[in-house]
C-alpha cells in the first residue's frame, strides 16, 4: 500500500494526460493507501467500511465522527460495532470531553434520547448549564403547524434578535415553511437564502453543522420514524441551539421529560 517514487514523479510530469492522485486512485481499482482519514465516519455502512479497509492494507486510519449524528439506518450504533469486524480491538477511541455550544440541560436531553434509542453516546461536559430546559409542547395533529408558528412568534417578540432555526422533516417542510413565512415574511428564509434572515426553516440535513440561538423541532418523533429508528437527524437537531430548544409534536421520543 505504498506510492513509489516513480509514481510520484509520473504524477508531477507536465503533460496533456496528467492525472491527479485522486483521479488515478479512482481509475485504478488496485490502488492502495498508507493512511486514510475519514470525516463524518458515523454515516458509513458496513459495506463502505469494507471498501475502505481493502484500500488500506495497513489498516491505518484516522476516523472522525459522532455516532449519535448518524442519519443512515445502516450505520453502526457504536464504534466497536463499526470497526471490530475489520481490526478487532486494535483501535484507540478518544472522545471529546467538553461541549462549548449547547447548554447542559439541552445536551443532556439529547444524550438521553440517543441512549434510549440504543446508541452508545458519551456526554461531554457542557461549559454552560443554561437557563432553560427543553420546552416540550405536545398538541393534537391539527394544531402542530399553528403551535410551531406561535413558538416562532413568541421568540421573535422577545426582541433580542435571536437567530431561530425551525427544523422539520422533508415531508412537512413545505407546509411548515409556508406557514412561518406567512406570519413572518420579512424575517424568514431557507437554507438557500439564509443570509440576513432571523428565522430559517430547515431539514435536519440542512441544519447539520449550523448553530442557532433557538431551535424549534417539529414532530421530533417523526424524525426518528422517517429514519427507521436512527437517532441522528433528531440528535443533530437537538444539539444546534445555544440557548433554547422547543419540541412541538403529537408525541415525543423516549428519554424526554414532561411538558414545559
Residue ranges and their predicted role:
Residues 12-16:
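Structured interface patches
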Residues 1-2:
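An amphipathic alpha-helix/rod signature
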Amino acid at each position: 500500500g505504498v506510492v513509489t517514487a516513480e509514481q510520484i514523479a509520473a504524477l508531477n510530469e507536465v503533460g496533456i494526460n496528467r492525472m491527479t492522485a485522486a483521479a488515478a486512485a479512482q481509475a485504478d481499482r488496485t490502488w492502495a493507501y498508507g493512511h486514510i482519514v475519514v470525516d463524518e465516519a458515523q454515516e458509513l455502512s458496513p459495506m463502505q467500511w469494507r471498501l475502505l479497509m481493502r484500500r488500506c492494507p495497513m489498516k491505518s486510519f484516522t476516523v472522525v465522527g459522532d455516532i449519535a449524528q448518524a442519519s443512515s439506518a445502516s450505520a453502526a450504533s457504536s464504534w466497536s460495532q463499526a470497526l471490530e469486524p475489520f481490526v478487532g480491538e486494535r483501535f484507540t477511541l478518544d472522545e471529546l470531553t467538553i461541549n462549548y455550544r449547547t447548554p447542559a440541560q439541552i445536551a443532556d436531553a439529547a444524550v438521553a434520547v440517543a441512549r434510549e434509542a440504543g446508541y452508545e453516546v458519551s456526554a461531554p461536559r457542557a461549559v454552560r448549564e443554561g437557563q432553560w430546559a427543553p420546552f416540550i409542547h405536545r398538541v393534537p395533529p391539527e394544531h402542530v403547524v399553528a403551535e410551531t408558528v406561535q413558538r416562532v412568534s413568541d421568540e421573535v417578540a422577545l426582541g433580542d434578535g435571536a437567530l431561530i432555526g425551525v427544523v422539520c422533516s422533508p415531508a412537512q417542510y413545505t407546509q411548515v415553511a409556508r406557514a412561518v413565512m406567512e406570519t413572518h415574511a420579512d424575517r424568514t428564509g431557507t437554507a438557500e437564502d439564509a443570509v440576513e434572515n432571523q428565522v430559517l426553516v430547515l431539514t435536519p440535513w440542512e441544519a447539520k453543522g449550523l448553530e442557532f440561538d433557538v431551535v424549534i423541532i417539529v414532530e421530533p418523533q417523526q424524525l426518528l420514524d422517517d429514519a427507521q429508528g436512527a437517532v441522528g437527524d433528531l440528535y443533530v437537531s437537538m444539539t444546534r441551539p445555544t440557548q433554547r430548544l422547543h419540541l412541538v409534536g403529537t408525541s415525543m421520543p423516549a428519554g424526554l421529560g414532561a411538558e414545559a
